[in-house]
From Swiss-Prot:
Organism: Homo sapiens (Human)
Signal peptide stretch: 1-28
The protein's name: Neurexin-2
Membrane-spanning ranges: 1637-1657
PTM info: O-glycosylated; contains heparan sulfate. Heparan sulfate attachment is required for synapse development by mediating interactions with neuroligins.
Length: 1712
């Protein structure tokens, strides 16, 4: 329909008068644009060869049909449309390609426009106002064949689609507006008929042939299809001027009639204008009209005056747009008369006890439901019939005649045996309480339209039923809101269900004992749920099979093009195919369902099929709404759907058109219901597009397009994509044999039909891909790899439900050699007993035995089958990749990833990841394992991965009976496979393109099929060999992995070259589908065989750390800083702790303890996520109540942005170029330093934000003018610190993840969140008491530990919190500690040695007008004394993690300084397993961490730079790695599969506290024993050190740092796992009310420093230049030629012992 309201012209008054006069003079018509509107003019003969058509129009419609003509459905047509407010002409001749003309002049502007259409043979021209264009058709014929009338503004509904050349024209929106001066050449055409128009000639009802006005009344059109008569000058009254001014009283309703039989009724019936013509009433006659809208009817009670007649007449007139409806019925049982409208034709059914007589009357063109008046007359007379044959001669029969409009006549004869029509029931007019139950009724719904002058006469009396109803006769009962005038009754508009998700909910259907439903539908799609309703279960659990717990249900569904009826009244269901042929042919199909108790019938296109429900129940108890077209998405899981309704389980909603829905004879306005419910995907019209939807190739990425109903359907199976057009990449999950995904459904599911599809890629020949499992039965549908084939197992636990026994699980096999590490597609289709298994479009079919078809399941599992209670053989775990799992329309993998469902559990990894499962290291050639005998008698499938630098070595050996054996070995860098099946040894060599001892992982597949074909595959290179003779490999003894004992090598067969074992790593070992744990399952383990695999590389390279992790070079290895990557693990390749935020939102809140809230000048935030949302809040950090500081990371319009406020205005930074709402994984990195900020998304360039101006200097300059001189310095310092608060994030109170509290909840994955040393997601996974979770959350797998690794503590935790401020206020003898600020690196760089005033961060006001701010613990100013650190560089300049220089200055610094308070809190501590530090804190082996201060830089600091202000320094250097922590050495507890390559080296000045660290005064120098370098490798946690990402365009490479080789210098050793403090380092300033002791201490410390420096200089100048002390225990490096992938040295040197407490004062060393 064209948009807009009803057309209302609004021209100026004078112009309006002129135009109205013009329109009246030119017979102008007003088109209302309503449904069913049309105008029909005489044929335009000039269109054949040459002619003109012109008219004027005025409209505001943008799309509508103006003109149409054609040749009657063959080839030629001409169509003039309004499209986008402009005229478009299409025409063709002789089936040529249609020509199209589109004019540019807009005409939908409420102005008058002149249109001229000119035909000239093959050429047609169109002109509007001053614009004209022409087009020509390239056809064989010159003339256009014109057979139709000229249609204007719409197509009459009686014109069939088959009679239209261009069928789509019937569904174009009708024209809305004014049309005048229509001429064909110079003459106006004759208007043959119209509907829905206003104007002088809008309706032929006023034409002389049909003028209803009598006695000279003036006919006028009052409304579409309704006329009125002006009787003012006729002397008559009434609606049609047929009544005298003083009419006589009407006769009694029951009058005797002396006229009988043949005197009253002629054989042919009265024609138009005869006695029966209601449109030509006699003088004094009044018409009686009533309007019926589907729920109204009236009935006359005949119980007191029963009918016994032999001659009858029924007359009435009707007007309707409806195709079906009951007009009149009387009688019951064997005597009845029924007159109905069915499919637009008049049906008559008469039964006098001797069998029904049926008559059908149809018009030649169109239908009777054309909203025009039609007269019906039915007569029954006694006649003598001279029939053919002896039995019919001279017999009396009753002649039945039915005529419509006096022209169309049908006759027939009834038998003479029953001559009387007897009825003592009711005369129903317009409907009945239950039309479907009336005997002989061909329809089940009531009439909708107008009925006029319904009269019944027989030889005894006359019943004027319409008059009696209007006058309210006591024997006449009225039902519904009857209106006794003819009103327009809109046709029941059809609706179109445009997608399978669309549906309309109808009120609950109360049809306990009887009920009827009729409707029309049309579609081209083979499957879909038409109707569904069900009751509640009779008790018991959802998982029970007991028939006592069945729920009643009623459904109609399309399956494979056939219509099925499904009905269950609680005692057994029936499933009946109601159509003998397919009904998805695109034509209208009429369905009529009627039920009475257990009996009933369903009729499809007048072909009826009876049914009888099983069981004894006759009550259909439905509780739910009656759903039309489909089911609501939200209720599909929670609603226990009956398994017999296959389309419900398959989520196959109906797509197509539905019209004329009647329930129990009452109409349902589908369009109104859809609009009231806001039904998505339900359109208020029905049209069938002729263009092929797939012609434009809409499916992307290789999707297969299929035609649907006015839509295309993209089959994305096998493409790796999902979505309507296969536009969205499907989620990939990686499995390593210990990983799974499990969908735990809220309720037990019972299905009889399943559609399953997925893609897989694996190198193993065995492994479970998908299985449905039940907690209560052995039911399963399982897909697994079995010997390189796809195996489908379907087991329906028939014994449990007591059904007829079956032969057990059904199995199907398809495909071969599917373990080729390529993507394959598998699909399973089950429909009851029928099975189909397809692999890469190759289909295998099977048929299940037994009558039981119901599959029960609670879970859908992938990777590992965890529900094992009812299976005897557990399938092997899967190693490989799965993608695109769709089970009955649900893409569970993607729903799980996106958080659309909350009932999934998984630890498999998202993304296509390299898989190395359960690696072990053979550290020497003499190491090996022995397992149980390899079972490889008839066939064999072996798979493993290896990595080594050794060119030779025995990988696998198993001997056997006789000469049988198998060997896999590495010879000169190539794999050899040697075997003997009894025919002598054979050798197969791998054909890899280069030696495989390159320290990279390689895949090896060795297989032998039952046909004795041997296959050796190295990575992607395959060698095959067929051996004749013996086919069985009879092995015995132990299977040796990695080597043999020395004395066995000499006894190996001659083709075996190995004389030594394998040195390197093995992983993912698969022995014929069995995944052994090489260490746990070993019968013997000889030598050094350990879990995990560490490569020989000990130096940083660009590939050392993945995902932009930063490589940190250590003394004997390297570590990776993963904090800003969202990943973890030794090389930043393991996913961080991941939570899935589901629908409805969720929230994770970390709350700092009130006394432990940090205030920061710098913040660092990194997080990974994936989502499809375009607006959400990811992370928000808030300050304490009243302060108003915050930081928020959010998604807006699909892009990432950050907004923060640290005391001034809101500051924003975003990345508008990176769209993150695409469902892919993205990593966001944000840093803040004061008001400066950087933001980076993935590998996009870093966005930087620097605020303009320096507010501090301007404020100080203004303030000094009003401050007394004597207070100037103190207030200057106070103001400076006050201004500094505008760059400090004060008193951080909580971190909130998920945005639920902000009203913008996030849905999707969040992974590896890192903020200022905190890993909140990991804390949440460990149930930290400071973390609270709420909403729909699910943890993916097992989250890594929140405790940072040893290396991380040294450089990450303290570096991130270097600017954390602790505010301390001291008054007299009382000390109160609050979150405040301490001197930092910047303080030590200023040249001002005056006392520093520390202002409270808790003061909520950043007042710039010098208002007094009173801290909570007092208002006095505390002036601490701070000792300055020297700016001179240390003697040894070490390299720190790369920090990008700021734009202005090239040199940069790395500040080093920390205290013990920077460590995580004791609540977060995790005791080390077997660690040495379990004793008391004063134990000599459990040293406290030592603070290290100073500068370390990769560049020499230029001391000539001008001194910088405190604020200016941080503005210039926004990214600074501030400090590191030195700890006492300790032996770590071993952890498998973790890199243990050493510790961070960071030499610097050492300060040893003489008291516990919390009491260490700022600047005080203490002494401690120097730390020895660690010889043992410290344990690594899941985290890694932090480093800021360098600012450079993508792609970003990991930063590489290195450490100088000074083994004798003290090394910064990482924190052990047992030593943890609060998350975030804190500097503590101790202040005193008296400064005397501080001054004395400073002087003494300075003197001591000078003495030490002089002594060191003296020793330096007098040292022996040719002698160096070197710690040989640390001075070694691996020789790659002598090492392999696992071993650096055969034996590590012993660690030097830590100096004992007795030697501390003796062996002290000091470094400055």
């Amino acid at each position: 329909m064209a948009s807009g309201s009803r057309w209302r012209p609004t021209p100026p008054p004078l112009l309006l008068l002129l135009l109205l006069a013009l329109a009246a003079r030119a017979d102008g018509l007003e088109f209302g644009g309503g449904p069913g509107q049309w105008a029909r003019y005489a044929r335009w003969a000039g269109a054949a060869s040459s002619g003109e058509l012109s008219f004027s129009l005025r409209t505001n419609a943008t799309r509508a049909l103006l003109l149409y003509l054609d040749d009657g459905g063959d080839c030629d047509f001409l169509e003039l449309l309004l499209v986008d407010g402009r005229l478009r002409l299409r025409f063709t001749l002789s089936c040529a390609e249609p020509a199209t003309l589109q004019l540019d002049t807009p005409v939908a502007d409420d102005r008058w426009h002149m249109v001229l259409l000119t035909r000239d043979a093959r050429r047609t021209a169109l002109a509007v106002d001053g614009e004209a264009r022409a087009a020509e058709v390239r056809s064989k014929r010159r003339e256009m064949q014109v057979a139709s009338d000229l249609f204007v503004g719409g197509i009459p509904p009686d014109v069939r689609l088959s009679a239209l050349t261009l069928s789509t024209v019937k569904y174009e929106p009708p024209f809305r507006g004014l049309l005048a001066n229509l001429k064909l050449g110079e003459r106006p055409p004759a208007l043959l008929g119209s509907q829905g128009l206003r104007g002088a000639t809008a309706d032929p009802l006023c034409a002389p042939a049909r003028n209803p006005c009598a006695n000279g009344g003036l006919c006028t059109v009052l409304a579409p299809g309704e006329v009125g008569c002006d009787c003012s000058h006729t002397g008559f009254g009434g609606k049609f001027c047929s009544e005298e001014e003083h009419p006589m009283e009407g006769p009694a309703h029951l009058t005797l009639n002396s006229e009988v039989g043949s005197l009253l009724f002629s054989e042919g019936g009265a024609g138009r204008g005869g006695a029966g013509d209601v449109h030509q009433p006699t003088k004094g006659k009044e018409e009686f009209v009533a309007t019926f809208k589907g729920n109204e009817f009236f009935c006359y009670d005949l119980s007191h005056n029963p009918i016994q007649s032999s001659t009858d007449e029924i007359t009435l007139a009707f007007r309707t747009l409806q195709r079906n409806g009951l007009m009149l019925h009387t009688g019951k049982s064997a005597d009845y008369v029924n007159l109905s409208l069915k499919s637009g034709a008049v049906w008559l059914v008469i039964n006098l006890g001797s069998g029904a007589f049926e008559a059908l009357v149809e018009p030649v063109n169109g239908k009777f439901n054309d909203n025009a008046w039609h007269d019906v007359r039915v007569t029954r007379n006694l006649r003598q019939h001279a029939g053919i044959g002896h039995a019919m001669v001279n017999k009396l029969h009753y002649l039945v005649t039915i005529s419509v409009d006096g022209i169309l006549t049908t006759t027939g004869y009834t038998q003479e045996d029953y001559t009387m029509l007897g009825s003592d029931d009711f005369f129903y007019i317009g409907g009945s309480p239950n039309t479907a139950d009336l005997p002989g009724s061909p329809v089940s719904n009531n009439f909708m339209g107008c009925l006029k002058d319904v009269v019944y006469k027989n030889n005894d009396f006359k019943l004027e039923l319409s008059r009696l109803a209007k006058e309210g006769d006591p024997k006449m009962k009225l039902q519904g809101d009857l209106s006794f005038r003819c009103e327009d009754v809109a046709a029941l508009d059809p609706v179109t269900f445009e997608s399978p998700e669309a549906f309309v909910a109808l009120p609950r259907w109360s049809a306990k004992r009887t009920g009827s439903i009729s409707l029309d539908f049309r579609t081209t799609e083979p499957n879909g749920l038409l109707l569904f309703s069900q009751g509640r279960r009779a008790g018991g659990g959802a998982g029970s099979h007991s028939s006592a717990q069945r729920a009643d249900y009623f459904a109609m569904e399309l399956l494979d093009g056939h219509l099925y009826l499904l009905l269950d009244m609680g005692s057994g269901g029936i499933k009946l195919r109601a159509s003998s042929r397919k009904v998805n042919d695109g034509e209208w199909c009429h369905v009529d369902f009627q039920r009475d108790g257990r009996k009933g019938s369903i009729s499809v296109n007048s072909r009826s099929t009876p049914f009888l429900a099983t069981g004894d129940s006759e009550i259909l108890d439905l509780e739910s709404e009656l759903y039309l077209g489909g089911l609501p998405e939200g209720g599909r899981v929670d609603l226990p759907l009956p398994p017999e309704v296959w389309t419900a389980a398959l989520r196959a909603g109906y797509v197509g058109c539905v019209r004329d829905l009647f329930i129990d004879g009452r109409s349902r306005d589908l369009r109104g219901l859809a609009e009231a419910q806001g039904a998505v995907g339900v359109a208020p019209f029905c049209s069938r597009e002729t263009l092929k939807q797939c012609a434009s190739a809409p499916c992307r990425n290789g999707g297969v397009c299929r035609e649907g109903w006015n839509r295309f359907i993209c089959d994305c199976i096998g493409t790796g994509f999902l979505g309507r057009v296969c536009e969205r990449e499907a989620t990939v999950l990686s499995y390593d044999g210990s990983m799974y995904m499990k969908i735990m459904l809220p309720n037990a599911m019972h299905t009889e039909a399943e559609d399953v599809s997925l893609r897989f890629m694996s190198q193993r020949a065995y492994g479970l891909m998908m299985a449905t499992t039940s907690r209560e039965s052995a039911d399963t549908l399982r897909l697994e790899l079995d010997g390189g084939q796809m195996k489908l197992t379907v087991n329906l636990d028939c014994l449990r439900v007591g059904c007829a026994p079956s032969k057990g699980p059904e199995t199907l096999f398809a495909g071969h050699k599917l373990n080729d590490n390529e993507w394959h597609t598998v699909r399973v289709v089950r429909r009851g007993k029928s099975l189909q298994l397809s692999v890469d479009n190759v289909t295998v079919e099977g048929q299940m035995a037994g009558a039981h078809m119901r599959l029960e399941f609670h879970n859908i599992e992938t990777g590992i089958m965890t529900e094992r209670r009812f299976i005897s053989v557990v399938p092997s775990n899967f190693i490989g990749h799965l993608s695109g799992l769709v089970f009955n329309g649900q893409p569970y993998m993607d729903q799980c990833k996106d958080g659309d469902i909350t009932y999934c559990e998984l630890n498999a990894r998202f993304g296509l990841r390299a898989i190395v499962a359960d690696p072990v290291t053979f550290k020497s050639r003499s190491s090996y394992l022995a397992l149980a005998t390899l079972q490889a008698y008839a066939s064999m499938h072996l798979f493993f991965q290896f990595k080594t630098t050794a060119p030779d070595g025995l990988l696998l050996f198993n001997s056997g009976n006789g000469n049988d054996f198998i060997v896999i070995e590495l010879v000169k860098g190539y794999i050899h496979y040697v075997f003997d099946l009894g025919n002598g040894p054979s050798l197969m060599k791998g054909n890899s393109d280069k030696p495989v001892n390159d320290n990279q992982w390689h895949n090896v597949v060795v297989s032998r099929d039952p046909g004795n074909v041997h296959t050796l595959k190295i990575d992607s290179r395959t060698v095959t060999q067929h051996s004749n003779g013996a086919r069985n490999l009879d092995l015995k003894g132990e299977l040796y992995i990695g080597g043999l004992s020395k004395n066995m090598f000499s006894n190996l067969p001659k083709l075996v070259a190995s004389r030594d074992g394998f040195q390197g790593c093995l992983a993912s070992v698969d022995l014929n589908g069995r995944l052994p744990d090489l260490i746990a399952d070993a019968l013997h383990r000889i030598g050094q065989v350990e879990r995990g695999c560490d490569g020989p590389s000990t130096t940083c390279t660009e590939e050392s750390c993945a995902n932009q992790g930063v490589c940190l070079q250590q003394w004997d290895g390297f570590t990776c800083d993963c904090t800003m990557t969202s990943y973890g693990g030794p090389v930043c390749n393991d996913p961080g702790t991941t939570y899935i935020f589901g629908k409805g939102g969720a929230l994770i809140t970390y709350t700092w303890p009130p006394n432990d809230r940090p205030s920061t000048r710098m913040d660092r935030l990194a997080v990974g996520f994936s989502t499809h949302q375009r607006s959400a809040v990811l992370v928000r950090v808030d300050s304490a109540s009243g302060l108003g500081d915050y930081l928020q990371l959010h998604i807006d319009q699909g892009t990432v942005g950050v907004i923060f406020n640290v005391g001034t205005d809101d500051i924003t930074i975003d990345e508008p170029n990176a769209i993150v709402s695409d469902g892919k994984y993205h990593v966001v990195r944000f840093t803040r330093s004061g008001g400066n900020a950087t933001l980076q998304v993935d590998s996009w360039p870093v966005n930087e934000r620097y605020p303009a101006g320096n507010f501090d200097n301007e404020r100080l300059a203004i303030a000094r003018q009003r401050i007394p001189y004597r207070l100037g310095r103190v207030v200057d310092e106070w103001l400076l610190d006050k201004g500094r608060q505008l760059t400090i994030f004060n008193s951080q109170a909580a971190i909130k993840i998920g945005g639920r509290d902000q009203g913008r909840p996030f849905q999707g994955q969040v992974s590896g969140l890192y903020y200022n040393g905190l890993k909140v997601l990991a804390l949440a996974a460990e149930s930290d008491p400071n973390v609270r979770t709420e909403g729909h959350l699910r943890l993916v797998g097992e989250g890594p530990s929140v405790l940072l690794s040893a290396e991380t503590t040294a450089t990450t935790l303290l570096a991130d919190m270097a600017t954390t401020i602790m505010e301390t206020t001291t008054t007299m003898a009382t000390t109160t500690t609050r979150r405040g600020r301490s001197p930092t690196l910047r303080d030590s760089t200023t040249q001002n040695t005056d006392d520093l005033l520390v202002a409270s961060a808790e003061c909520p006001s950043d007042d710039e007008d010098l208002e007094e701010c009173e801290p909570s613990t007092g208002g006095e100013l505390i002036l601490p004394i701070i000792t300055e650190d020297s700016l001179d560089p240390p003697p040894v300049a070490t390299r720190s993690p790369f920090v990008p220089p700021p734009p202005t200055f090239y040199p940069f610094l790395t500040g080093v300084g920390a205290t013990q308070d920077t460590l995580p809190p004791p609540a977060a501590r995790r005791p080390p397993s077997g660690g040495p530090c379990q004793a008391e804190r004063d134990d000599s082996d459990c040293e406290e961490p030592i603070e290290a201060s100073g500068f370390a830089s990769g560049e020499v600091f230029d001391s000539s730079l001008p001194p910088t202000d405190d604020e200016d320094f941080y503005t210039t250097f926004p990214l600074v790695t501030d400090r590191t922590t030195l700890l006492s050495p300790r032996k770590p507890a071993p952890r498998p599969n973790l890199r243990t390559d050493g510790a961070t080296g960071a030499p610097g000045v050492l300060f040893a506290p003489s008291a516990p660290a919390p009491n260490l005064p700022a600047g005080k120098m203490n002494h401690r024993d120097p730390l020895q370098p660690l010889l043992e490798n410290p344990p690594l946690g899941p985290g890694a050190p932090t480093s800021f990402e360098p600012r450079r365009p993508p792609p970003l490479r990991p930063g590489v740092t290195s450490a100088p080789g000074f083994p004798h210098l003290p090394t910064a050793n990482p924190t052990g796992p047992g030593e943890r403090g609060p998350p975030g380092a804190v500097e503590v300033i101790r202040e005193s009310s008296s400064t005397t002791g501080m001054v004395v201490g400073i002087v003494a410390a300075a003197a001591l420093c000078i003495l030490i420096l002089l002594y060191a200089m003296y020793k330096y100048r007098n040292r022996d230049e040719g002698s160096y002390q070197v710690d040989q225990s640390r001075n070694y490096i691996s020789n790659s030629a002598q090492s392999n992938g696992a071993v650096v040295k055969e034996k590590a040197p012993a660690a030097p012992k830590t100096p004992s407490k007795a030697k501390k004062n003796k062996d002290k060393e000091y470094y400055v």
